Amino acid sequence: MDTIITNAFFENKTTIELARDILGMRLVHQTTNGKLSGLIVETEAYLGATDMAAHSFQNLRTKRTEVMFSSPGRIYMYQMHRQVLLNFITMPEGIPEAILIRAIEPEEQAKHLMEQNRGGKTGYELTNGPGKLTQALGLSMQDYGKTLFDSNIWLEEAKTPHLIEATNRIGVPNKGIATHFPLRFTVKGSPYLSAQRKSRILADIWE
């Protein structure tokens, strides 16, 4: 069995470092119907008080963002366009930074259940976006505030990417200089990346 990530993983690292290091890890959701899982292939870092694209910009503290001010490994779920998005808090209490999980590569043994959750969607469309992966994994707003260390959602060490690319984040226009921050991190060549071009898909993406 692969090593389950503990809170030690989050210690002495920046949010940017964590957003890169989490690529290739297995994201697991244990449900009553079975274990659903996939390898993380795309993330975005959100840098809190100084990041205009972050919900917690200027330390904005609301009912929705309250969990962002808690401890590393806490789960921040929010809704956008009727989709639910999954984030992990990264910094010590009071520093509201987070990682958005944008795409995963579904694992073969979990695909059938994940396809059912997605209404029969198959192939790359299954999990190649932040709202798609949460639906496939059966995650919901009820998971808001859970931790990765003592709940039915956790991370495991799994694979190491050959190459990681950094680009601008998706869907954050009109956010000043934050629009152009290279804070989207991807496993180069993964077919499951959001808006991935066929010409950029590689056959061998893991070490």
From Swiss-Prot:
Pfam families: Pur_DNA_glyco. The keyword DNA damage applies. SUPFAM superfamilies: FMT C-terminal domain-like. Its EC number is 3.2.2.-. Keywords: DNA damage, DNA repair, Hydrolase. One of its GO terms (molecular function) is DNA binding. InterPro entries: Formyl_transferase-like_C_sf, MPG, MPG_sf. The keyword Protein biosynthesis does not apply. GO terms for biological process: base-excision repair. Gene3D superfamilies: Methylpurine-DNA glycosylase (MPG). NCBIfam families: 3mg, PRK00802.1-2. Belongs to the DNA glycosylase MPG family. This is Putative 3-methyladenine DNA glycosylase. It comes from Listeria monocytogenes serotype 4a (strain HCC23).
